[in-house]
Amino acid sequence: MEGDSAGGSGKGARNRNTQALLPLKGKILNVLGAASSKLNTNAEINDLCEALGVGMGTKFNLDDLRYDKIIIMTDADVDGAHIAALLMTFFYTQMRPMIDAGHLYLACPPLYRLTQGAKRVYVADDAEKDMWLEKGLGGKGKIDLQRFKGLGEMDAKDLKETTMDPTTRKLIRVTVDEEMPGETGDLVERLMGKKPELRYQYIQENAQFVEELDV
């Protein structure tokens, strides 16, 4: 879980019998191209391995994994997406069997909460927010809109309902396309590697498909 919010509303939202939280402060190391000595001495990575009960790279043993679902939970903004990308890069390069076995997920926290009388909805983006603002929620009075700047701005009830309760949350399972595994590796290298010209080329090739940009 991203940030100090894990110490507050996150702990209040979890099921202590089945869910554990590991707070990560800031952006973790980009492991792609990093020396093994740097990986082995990185505090955040060591904490992560210890919490999961597994090693990295050739020392990874899927049988030692302590949890069935490893869920990356970050803020619903650009910085949160960057942290999620860094974590997925780490898991892809150092714990690939965990992904292949279907254990890695992304949480889908909302960006907005809309309330109208007794009616309440959570939405993930501006397009959905605008749709509800236009049509209304069906409650009484005006619509109250709150934007969550981060997970820490949610109270335990919000966080549980939207992100942590298995009966109401939304998760995205992280997978590798079995028909094009090499293409996945190439894409990770282009986006997360040490050659900025490859990232620039990717942006140039795909900028036409961007409809909304949060910067």
Question: For each of these PLM feature ranges, what is it?
Answer:
Residues 1-215:
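Conserved phosphate-chemistry cores used by DNA topoisomerases
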